[in-house]
């Protein structure tokens, strides 16, 4: 429920396999204007990544204060849902490169990055919130489980906004 999250906690991203069945109204609009390559089509129909084995393994080994599945609503709507109202998610957009399919969608659809973060997962399928002291152990554990994991941000005291990018 996220009630254990605290300012200073680290946010660890798990890479997505593609859009994960979200944002397809927007994706269809882009595809009406621009024809995707066969590789891009493959990315668009890649099955949604399932994280259950990795997450169960993680929570059995290390403390996890909150978990956010980045579905419809993207980072902007999903991260605030798992944090108490006095906290905010501070995301570092330079911590990862948008996967190619999301770069193509943004360029061909002329989509503002804020809209991308609101509608699509932008390559981030899940975020786990962990104590700062366990951040690197969490990343290492998830990588051993076969995930692409990285530090995407931290939990901070809210200044009235629940997400800062």
Q: PLM ranges: what are they?
A:
Residues 33-165:
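Glycine-/charge-enriched secondary-structure boundary and capping motifs
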Residues 1-35, 162-163:
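Phosphate/diphosphate-binding glycine-rich loops and adjacent basic-rich segments that engage nucleotide
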């Amino acid at each position: 429920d996220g009630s254990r999250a605290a300012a200073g906690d680290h946010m660890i991203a798990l890479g997505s396999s593609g859009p994960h069945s979200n944002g397809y109204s927007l994706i269809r609009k882009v595809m009406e204007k621009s024809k995707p390559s066969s590789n891009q089509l493959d990315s668009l129909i890649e099955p949604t990544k399932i994280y259950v084995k990795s997450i169960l393994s993680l929570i059995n080994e290390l403390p996890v204060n909150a978990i956010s599945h980045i579905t419809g609503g993207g980072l902007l709507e999903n991260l605030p849902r798992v944090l108490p109202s006095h906290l905010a998610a501070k995301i570092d957009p330079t911590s990862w490169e948008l996967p190619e399919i999301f770069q193509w969608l943004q360029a061909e659809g002329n989509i503002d990055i804020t809209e991308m973060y609101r509608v699509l997962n932008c390559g981030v399928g899940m975020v786990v919130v962990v104590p700062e002291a366990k951040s690197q152990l969490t990343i290492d554990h998830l990588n051993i489980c076969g995930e692409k994991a990285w530090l995407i941000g931290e939990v901070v005291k809210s200044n009235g906004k629940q997400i800062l990018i």
